[in-house]
Amino acid sequence: MNIFARLSAIAAMAITISACSEQGANIEMPLPVALGEDSVGHYCNMTILEHTGPKAQIHLVNNPHPIWFSQVRDGIAFLRSPEENYETVAVYVNDMGKAEDWDFPGDDTWIDAQKAWFVIGSAKTGGMGTPEAIPFGEEQSASAFVTENGGVVVRLAEIPDAYVLGPVGVDQKQEVSMTGANQ
């Protein structure tokens, strides 16, 4: 390939990348969507309204409908999972400091997950009965929750991958017996 062809190919790639970057910058952040009978959990494939506790909704590029999660922990796992490599536009979670009812936080409690404070490692579990990353709009509300329920207050980026991607209800120190396994 001659030098002119190489430079032309590089210029074409640069223009394409630039156009994609500009397109991504122009994507408008959607508003949170109210839960409805058609809100189905991404992983559990169950109606979200059947589960108690905080929820998450994730909005993706070129998808007019949010992806629902019956637990905030599952939404964070989706964001961090290497298999789920979608371009995210917005992530909303329930502000449990504003929720009048733990079981059903309400559609007026959605906040941007990037701005939330999370309590991890508390005695409270999520809608699927597993450990939860409990979101709050204010650090003071999260700290008050910790006083009553235990745990630690962190930001979204500080939640350990192992907390959301690791196994639940399994003693990780337990050795698995390979007796009888095909080797």
Please report, for each region that a protein language model flagged, where it lies by residue.
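Mid-length scaffold segments of soluble, non-membrane domains
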Residues: H65-P105, T109-W110
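Bacterial N-terminal signal peptides that target proteins for export
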Residues: M1-A9
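Short cysteine-rich clusters marking metal-coordination/redox-active sites
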Residues: G41
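Short, intrinsically disordered, charge-biased short linear motifs at domain edges
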Residues: R6, A25-V33
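Bacterial signal peptide processing site
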Residues: S21-Q23
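Thiol/selenol-based redox catalytic cores and closely related redox-interacting motifs
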Residues: Y92-F145, V152, L156
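Cys/His-coordinated zinc-binding microdomains
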Residues: N45
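C-terminal motif of bacterial Sec signal peptides marking the signal peptidase cleavage site
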Residues: T16-A19
